Curated annotation (Swiss-Prot):
Keyword Nucleus part of the UniProt annotation: yes
GO biological process entries: transcription initiation at RNA polymerase II promoter
Subcellular location: Cytoplasm; Nucleus
Family label: Belongs to the TAF3 family.
Record-linked CDD domains: HFD_SF
One cellular component term from this protein's GO annotations in UniProt: chromatin
Protein name (database record): Transcription initiation factor TFIID subunit 3
Gene3D superfamilies according to UniProt: Histone, subunit A (1.10.20.10)
Function description: Functions as a component of the DNA-binding general transcription factor complex TFIID. Binding of TFIID to a promoter (with or without TATA element) is the initial step in pre-initiation complex (PIC) formation. TFIID plays a key role in the regulation of gene expression by RNA polymerase II through different activities such as transcription activator interaction, core promoter recognition and selectivity, TFIIA and TFIIB interaction, chromatin modification (histone acetylation by TAF1), facilitation of DNA opening and initiation of transcription.
GO molecular function: protein heterodimerization activity; RNA polymerase II general transcription initiation factor activity
Length: 155
């Protein structure tokens, strides 16, 4: 693949992430130009954070950055102000339910008891249909027999 094709692929993947982020924030419609601008800003921000963290690692004569380098980079670009309260808030967020759900969805759950064997959508659909079959599947719908009786009584 050419360099431009790879860049376009990564941009498209990041645009999906950005659109999902906007949707999670309650914005369900946007212009394509705005989404592309938001994606570009996000890419530049992540690039700045990673380059700054890598520079901190190189100062320490390491080839890979660690959590301390990332924290210093966050302070340098203004994401954290260096206070202990900011760090506590960040640690609470990492230990919170949002990140736990992200780990579960991505398959990085460390506790083997909470891992569920994945099922494909067709198997799940078939099992759901097997559990609810016959007249019960129309319970509390417009097709249920109880609704027909109520309609007759109202007439």
């Amino acid at each position: 693949m050419e360099e431009t094709q790879i860049d376009e692929l990564y941009f498209s993947l990041m645009r999906i992430f950005c659109s999902q982020t906007l949707r999670a924030a309650g914005i369900d419609r946007t212009k394509v130009s705005l989404l592309n601008s938001f994606t570009d800003i996000t890419i530049r921000y992540i690039r700045l954070l990673s380059e700054t963290a890598m520079a901190k690692a190189e100062v320490g004569r390491r080839s890979c950055c660690d959590l301390g380098d990332l924290r210093l980079a966050m302070e340098e670009i203004g994401l954290l102000n260096g206070s202990e309260e900011d760090v506590k808030t960040l640690v609470e967020w990492f230990n919170g339910p949002q990140v736990a759900e992200l780990r579960r969805v991505s398959g990085f759950v460390q506790d083997s008891e909470t891992q569920v064997k994945p099922k494909d959508w067709l198997t799940s659909l078939i099992q759901k249909q097997i559990r609810v079959s016959g007249p019960e599947r129309f319970y509390e719908t417009v097709f249920s027999a109880s609704n027909e009786e109520e309609d007759v009584k109202d007439s």
